[in-house]
Amino acid sequence: MKFNATARSVQGSSASRRLRRAGRVPAIVYGGSAAPLNIELDHNEIYHALRKEEFHASILQMQLDGKEEAVLLRSVQWHAYKPQVLHVDFQRVDANQALHTKVPLHFINGENSPAVKLSSAIISHVVTELEITCLPAALPQYIEVDLGNLLGGGSVHLSDVKLPKGVTYVAHGSDANPVLASALVKGGGAAAADEGGDAAAAETPAA
């Protein structure tokens, strides 16, 4: 995706407020061999771009003063109660340097899984994005998680998903294989209790 930016020389909170009143958004781009650069964006353009998933998880082409530069969205500051973008951070992308970022998960075939069709289970998406590292050329817009074989009461782990070539999951702590989705069977607790009661009754000898 492409977006337009303009270099800005005036900094400070007062200057930022003036920009926002004029329908502009203060931003910064950093990283790589160049110094951090303060830029400004059109609010309407960046607001609508931020509503698209791909803007958050793909290499972006920034059009700045007649030149194009590859960047990655790093953070967005929103107004506390208004639909207003206050500030945006971008990172320059070096084709030969690995990225460390998050990508969304797309869950498919859940409605066709045995968990739903046979057990009427409720599927919970435990994790909705993964932290990964990869070279820019290998960065996926999303990672697909197929739930087609999920059974009632079962779960899908990261090890059940084939990551795109060149993509490595960044684990936190000891959880190298997190649960991505699980299937909760309705009334499972009650059914289990009934089964336990039946089993206990069966083991009790008749008087």
UniProtKB/Swiss-Prot annotation:
The keyword Membrane does not apply. GO terms for biological process: translation. Gene3D superfamilies: Ribosomal protein L25, beta domain, Ribosomal Protein L25, Chain P. The keyword rRNA-binding applies. It comes from the Bacteria. Keywords: Ribonucleoprotein, Ribosomal protein, RNA-binding, rRNA-binding. Pfam families: Ribosomal_L25p, Ribosomal_TL5_C. One of its GO terms (cellular component) is cytosolic large ribosomal subunit. Signal peptide: none annotated. CDD domains: Ribosomal_L25_TL5_CTC. GO terms for molecular function: 5S rRNA binding; structural constituent of ribosome. Belongs to the bacterial ribosomal protein bL25 family. CTC subfamily. Part of the 50S ribosomal subunit; part of the 5S rRNA/L5/L18/L25 subcomplex. Contacts the 5S rRNA. Binds to the 5S rRNA independently of L5 and L18. PANTHER family: RIBOSOMAL PROTEIN L25/GLN-TRNA SYNTHETASE, ANTI-CODON-BINDING DOMAIN-CONTAINING PROTEIN, RIBOSOMAL PROTEIN L25_GLN-TRNA SYNTHETASE, ANTI-CODON-BINDING DOMAIN-CONTAINING PROTEIN. HAMAP family: Ribosomal_bL25, Ribosomal_bL25_CTC. This is one of the proteins that binds to the 5S RNA in the ribosome where it forms part of the central protuberance. This is Large ribosomal subunit protein bL25. It comes from Bordetella petrii (strain ATCC BAA-461 / DSM 12804 / CCUG 43448). The gene is rplY.
